[in-house]
UniProtKB/Swiss-Prot annotation:
Presence of keyword Signal: no
Activity regulation as described: Activated by ATP and maltotriose, which are both required for DNA binding.
Family to which this protein belongs: Belongs to the MalT family.
One of the record's GO molecular function terms: DNA-binding transcription factor activity
Name of the protein in question: HTH-type transcriptional regulator MalT
Source species, domain of life: Bacteria
Function, as annotated: Positively regulates the transcription of the maltose regulon whose gene products are responsible for uptake and catabolism of malto-oligosaccharides. Specifically binds to the promoter region of its target genes, recognizing a short DNA motif called the MalT box.
Gene name of this polypeptide: malT
Residues covered by the HTH luxR-type domain: 832-897
Amino acid sequence: MWIPSKLTRPGRLHNAIVRPRVLELLQQAPYYKLVLFRSPAGYGKTTMAAQWLADKTNVGWYSIDDSDNDGFRFINYLLQALNKATNGNCNNAQKLAEKRQFSSLRSLFSDVFAEMVDFHQECYVVLDDYHVINNEEVHEAMRFFLKHMPDNLTLVVTSRANPPLGTANLRVRDLMIEIGNEMLAFDTEETTRFFNQRVADGIDEDTANNLRNYVEGWPSALQLIALQAQHQKRTLAQSAESVSQFNHAHLWDYLVEEVFDLLDADTRKFLMQVSVLDHFNDELVYALTQREDALGMIESLNRYGLFIYPLEGEQNWFRFHNLFGEFLSHERQARIPQQEQELNRNAAIAWLKQKSPHQAIRHAQKAYDGELVAEILNEFGWKMFNQGELSTLESAINLLEKDLLFSNPKLTMLRAWLAQSQHRYNQVGTLLAEAENEHKKRNIDLDIQYQGQANALLAQVAINSNDPEKALELAELALSQLDSTVYRSRIVATSVVGEVNHVIGRLDRALPMMQQTEKLARQYQVYHQALWAILQQSEILIAQGYVQAAFELQDSAFRLIEEQQLQHVPLHEFLLRVRAQVLWCWNRLDEAEECAYKGLQILENHAPSKHLHSYSMLARIAIGRGELDRAGKFIEHIQHLMKQSTYHVDWTANASLSLILYWQAKGKLNAIQEWLDTAVRPENACNHFCQLQWRNIARAHINLGQYDQARQALNFLQSEAEKANLVTDRNRNLIIEAIFAVHQKDENQAKVLLKEALQLTNQTGMVGNFLIDGATIGTLLEKLTNRHELGDLERHRALQLMKDISSNQRSRSVHFDEEFVEKLVTHPNVPELVRTSPLTQREWQVLGLIYSGFSNEQIAQELDVAGTTIKTHIRNLYQKLNIANRKEAVTTAENLLQLMGY
């Protein structure tokens, strides 16, 4: 799929004159981020860059054309060039790019820089003809690339226009060398050497100066003048006279009169035919022109100096100088317009022989040959789909006439899959219905395999739209229709059957279906679907109470991601999300927090609405640590996102838990009541997310003292959990029931419920749900352990919980939130120094973190401020409290906590 000539730098530079004044300026290039060659066409930007880098070993060259505005193609070529420059140090990132397994160009570049950390040699990457890029996503990514790339790498850009790469900032910071047309234009000395090298009679200084002034040092025009002198046997003085009125607007006329008309008709025809190709080798040219002497013609033209650049490599790839290529295109369309379609059609066929359907489609479209486009899509469409050429495919399909599109069921199915793969689920049904109707009009019978593929696709759409009954019906119908050879659709249908059974609480049926999905997906190397199946299995095992088994299964998902370079796909965030939820329930908050932040990084280039789960987890972690100020910031994010978007109950239930826990900790009963007034009440609770939503409702009623409604919700929860054998949810529900019993002043019942919950926790390991209500159940746990009412395992678990609850309460106190500080400064026994020299809220926070053992750097990270700011806060609080050092600060904090009864 990739064109070798785009990654090879121009060769055969022996005819180019050495330009010491430019090379001298470039000696300092390793100390700069960017070297920019910027000038109009024909000033020798590419030649100068190639000459300068000719003796450099670590160079990657990328020749850009307009097809590279596709971000996927651009990043692939760029990484191949970078890999060449770094001796293969970016292989993993290149594989990610080739498989389109990255969430954003920024995240992919982060991986690139991580891979380059051990490569310390001076290296260069050239982006030749960057001016053709008009894709803002590419520009933004390259600005990020420039900002963060390692110091041993220098980016070299040739462009006709000023590229939007933050060059003004680089210029001000002296991080860029700019070679403009003033520098690239020949001076008189260079003009003299240039002509002396090409013209037998040489040139005098006055004539050189006159010629140089006529064309303002424009190298391409000087080259044309030299050609004119050689072929018309004129002196350079005579040539100077003929170009005295030369300007850019007259370039075509000048080239016709002084170069093109001097060629024989056969050569002119050959050049015009070949100019339909942006890049070419002898095989392409032979397929296009049917000339067996294609390579000989190319080489003779190169020797003739007709702006054909030989490129490095064994494939004998060439390209025209951009200016000359544009000129030839102009002549071709003016002189042989009747051949334009045939030439482009032949070019398309030639590119197909090179196994490059992307280029073939482009030429077939230029030939206005819809039938050929359809043939290419029929033959290569699914291959291109699997390789991530989605935008090219969709553009090609959309440009097909209706008769061509709807005469090919394979293409209409591909069109629907393109919509589904780009998350436009609401369009899939419409597209398939339109296709079926149009096929009927044309008397095209859709075989049962087509119907099976359509039903599998519609089943996926139905489950995405929260319609499990319809999804199950369609998926089972699809499986009855599809042959085993139609593996993609069978995998999707099998997955949907498993997911539906998961949603409706038939876990014993859901698990084997997801295991079968994983097996099929691995067998046919559909790794995204394999990862999805593993994640579904993990959630099912968690619901069944086999949390450790789920955790180990997640490890296999991480291995699959590593093996298949899936680090940047959204499903990676799903895995991190489920892992974070397990870690939170096991009270491994630091690891859960790390997973949440990694998830945000993966989704950085996706809509903010996708960040809800991560913020929900971060808020819950902060609440668990007693960091209510920090939790408040996450809560604001959550509330904003929930107002802006519509979410599945799985998402809203998780977010609502964090909201209610925060309001519970802050005593905001009005907020809880407002939430309860509008809360979704699912008809059943046969899966983990509906269970969570009903627990949220029960918790809200308990906080508000609405005990009858709380009792009803709890009875419904346990009934549904037992019917679906949701062991882990039964575990969580028992804890909520115990809290309800405490509020009802029924201590004996609360202890019975806690004892049962502890027994289930031996299987699930769920301790986080105890800890969030530690203040309520801590005393009961102590009584259970003191009276020897528990078995050995349960007693050990209860003792550990009591220790964690005590630690959490201490953690809350040492963070010195506003409520704690207000009570402290109004305490009758508080030292006078504290009362008369009040600390700011931030200084109290710093004191608490010092007491917790945080270093200055850790405090800065915790509060998200600069280290110098923390030093200022510490200096201020030391002065106000008459403290000499950190040890005294810890003692002071300890005394204040003891004063408050901690």
